[in-house]
Amino acid sequence: MKMVAPWTRFYSHSCCLCCHVRTGTILLGVWYLIINAVVLLILLSALADPNQYHFSGSELGGEFEFMDDANMCIAIAISLLMILICAMATYGAYKQHAAWIIPFFCYQIFDFALNTLVAITVLVYPNSIQEYIRQLPPSFPYRDDIMSVNPTCLVLIILLFIGILLTLKGYLISCVWSCYRYINGRNSSDVLVYVTSNDTTVLLPPYDDATAVPSTAKEPPPPYVSA
């Protein structure tokens, strides 16, 4: 039998050094659920009252609208899908249904891949940052201050920020995956114990039945008498 050290067991089943991976997955799912619910409320209010979030072309520095109705509907659909995925992950971690966590885990992988592509783009094309900042509207907060920063320092700052963000996202992915493995392992062990207990009950009869003399046993032959 393989022995596992207590600290190894605690590390593999814990996150943030303070809570279980199952609890951490539930909290992470609730956090994402709240964020997407707030985004959905903002989008619905903007769809109900377009003038509240309307920006003219002069404010945006171009001849285009901030967001039309088609893009608004797509954003609302994405928010609803994210709410469903986060709710499934929260419910799956709470009720210990490992399959319900898979969609949220796939979303984390997709988000991590997108951020990695952004980091690679910044690293390969550092001048694209300056071009992107120039395209921002003049009323954008701290636009002039960002433009005045040394381009090399700006690239390093952005890469450092993306690196920290990727590290955090990678750790959260490992926590969700550990929760999935924990629930799968626990369900498998419960099934194994159930099957083993049933087999033991069938194979081992009660002690009284095993030691009792059956009523159909043959009587011993009569004693031998010599002639």
From Swiss-Prot:
Keywords: Cell membrane, Cell projection, Endosome, Lysosome, Membrane, Transmembrane, Transmembrane helix, Transport, Ubl conjugation. Its main location: membrane. It is a multi-pass membrane protein. The chain crosses the membrane at residues 26-46, 72-92, 100-120, 153-173. Undergoes proteolytic cleavage following delivery to the lysosomes. Ubiquitinated by NEDD4. InterPro entries: LAPTM4/5, LAPTM_transporter. GO terms for cellular component: cell projection; early endosome; endosome; late endosome membrane; lysosomal membrane; lysosome; multivesicular body membrane; multivesicular body, internal vesicle. It is found in: Endomembrane system; Late endosome membrane; Cell membrane; Cell projection. Pfam families: Mtp. One of its GO terms (molecular function) is ceramide binding. Residues 205-222 are annotated as: Required for NEDD4 interaction. GO terms for biological process: endosome organization; endosome transport via multivesicular body sorting pathway; negative regulation of lysosomal protein catabolic process; negative regulation of transforming growth factor beta1 production; regulation of lysosomal membrane permeability; regulation of lysosome organization. The keyword Transmembrane helix applies. Required for optimal lysosomal function. Blocks EGF-stimulated EGFR intraluminal sorting and degradation. Conversely by binding with the phosphatidylinositol 4,5-bisphosphate, regulates its PIP5K1C interaction, inhibits HGS ubiquitination and relieves LAPTM4B inhibition of EGFR degradation. Recruits SLC3A2 and SLC7A5 (the Leu transporter) to the lysosome, promoting entry of leucine and other essential amino acid (EAA) into the lysosome, stimulating activation of proton-transporting vacuolar (V)-ATPase protein pump (V-ATPase) and hence mTORC1 activation. Homooligomer; upon reaching the lysosomes. Interacts with MCOLN1. Interacts with NEDD4; may play a role in the lysosomal sorting of LAPTM4B; enhances HGS association with NEDD4; mediates inhibition of EGFR degradation. Interacts with PIP5K1C; promotes SNX5 association with LAPTM4B; kinase activity of PIP5K1C is required; interaction is regulated by phosphatidylinositol 4,5-bisphosphate generated by PIP5K1C. Interacts with HGS; promotes HGS ubiquitination. Interacts with SNX5. Belongs to the LAPTM4/LAPTM5 transporter family. PANTHER family: LYSOSOMAL-ASSOCIATED TRANSMEMBRANE PROTEIN (PTHR12479), LYSOSOMAL-ASSOCIATED TRANSMEMBRANE PROTEIN 4B (PTHR12479:SF6). This is Lysosomal-associated transmembrane protein 4B. It comes from Mus musculus (Mouse). The gene is Laptm4b.
